[in-house]
């Protein structure tokens, strides 16, 4: 009898502990969806078994696979020495140095913009000085740089390590996207606006600001947003499948009790439980990605096939 009493006491203590801990279960990004599907299953008499989705987010090709080939400059060292009297001489010297040849794509773009900004004045100077052949060669180099400008912008932005990091998938979190900021959005907007200026013939650039903007992009949440939207879509597809599996609740002669309960389930567990975060995800999408899509549109004639294949997947 004493043994049975001890067993009963231990069992009761265990059950009380479990009941006390039920409210302490940590909520995650799946919780609201699981509760909604379980309530749907009970209401529609379809069972409450749910399967947590395992979303797979495609990552863009690595920067080395995306980078567009940039031909070497047409101006050789002899031409560079002949440019005395032009501010452009310093820019060409930096470009042709060992550091210039090994520079990051962002620095190569900034040097090209500096070249395009300074070249017209140097061409005018050489022409006035009677150096017509050299002026002609410099103008040819300017035209080459101008033709390569979209490729240089692509290499420094969409094909860069910073944008690769932007698309890095992160675990789905219930705090997302409430825990984000507007800094990366501002950076993307500035990069897109600067690219538009450069492509329209205004080659001035704030080198430090551009590098800081790229750094901000690298900490952005493009991959996290993509995964969160995919995660949400898979859960809602499961909910829709349950509704389709059940079919119409009412007939001409019968209205079951579940027809009275279902609107309350949808209101409490979908409209109140899921929709607020879904709306936040929608807002984040429409704030974060439009400047990036606009940049892609500006560079569309230079986007390589592997980038297009990834972005359209």
Where are these regions (language model features)?
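Hydrophobic membrane-insertion alpha-helices, especially the h-region
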Residues: 13-17
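C-terminal motif of bacterial Sec signal peptides marking the signal peptidase cleavage site
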Residues: 20-23
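N-terminal Sec/ER secretory leader and immediately downstream segment
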Residues: 27-179
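Extended amphipathic alpha-helical interaction segments
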Residues: 139-295
């Amino acid at each position: 009898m004493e043994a049975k009493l001890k067993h009963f006491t231990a069992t009761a203590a265990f059950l009380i502990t479990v009941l006390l801990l039920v409210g302490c279960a940590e909520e995650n990004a799946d919780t609201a969806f699981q509760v909604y599907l379980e309530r749907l299953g009970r209401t529609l008499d379809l069972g409450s078994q749910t399967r947590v989705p395992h979303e797979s987010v495609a990552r863009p090709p690595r920067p080395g696979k995306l980078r567009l080939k940039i031909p070497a400059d047409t101006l050789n060292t002899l031409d560079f020495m002949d440019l005395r009297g032009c501010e452009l001489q310093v820019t060409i010297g930096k470009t042709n140095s060992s550091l210039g040849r090994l520079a990051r794509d962002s620095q190569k773009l900034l040097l090209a913009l500096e070249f395009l900004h300074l070249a017209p004045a140097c061409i005018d100077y050489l022409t006035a000085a009677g150096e017509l052949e050299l002026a002609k060669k410099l103008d040819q180099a300017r035209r080459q740089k101008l033709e390569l400008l979209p490729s240089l912008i692509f290499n420094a932005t969409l094909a860069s390590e910073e944008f690769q990091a932007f698309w890095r998938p992160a675990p789905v979190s219930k705090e997302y996207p409430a825990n984000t900021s507007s800094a990366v959005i501002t950076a993307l907007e500035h990069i897109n606006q600067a690219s538009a200026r450069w492509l329209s013939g205004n080659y001035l650039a704030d080198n430090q600001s551009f590098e800081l903007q790229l750094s901000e992009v690298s900490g952005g949440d493009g991959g996290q947003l993509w995964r969160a939207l995919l995660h949400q879509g898979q859960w809602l597809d499961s909910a829709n499948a349950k509704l389709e599996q059940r079919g119409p609740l009412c007939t001409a002669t019968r209205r079951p009790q579940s027809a009275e309960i279902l609107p309350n389930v949808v209101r409490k567990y979908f409209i109140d439980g899921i929709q607020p975060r879904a709306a936040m995800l929608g807002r984040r999408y429409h704030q974060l990605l439009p400047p990036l899509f606009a940049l892609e549109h500006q560079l569309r004639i230079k986007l390589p096939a592997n980038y297009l294949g990834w972005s359209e997947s």
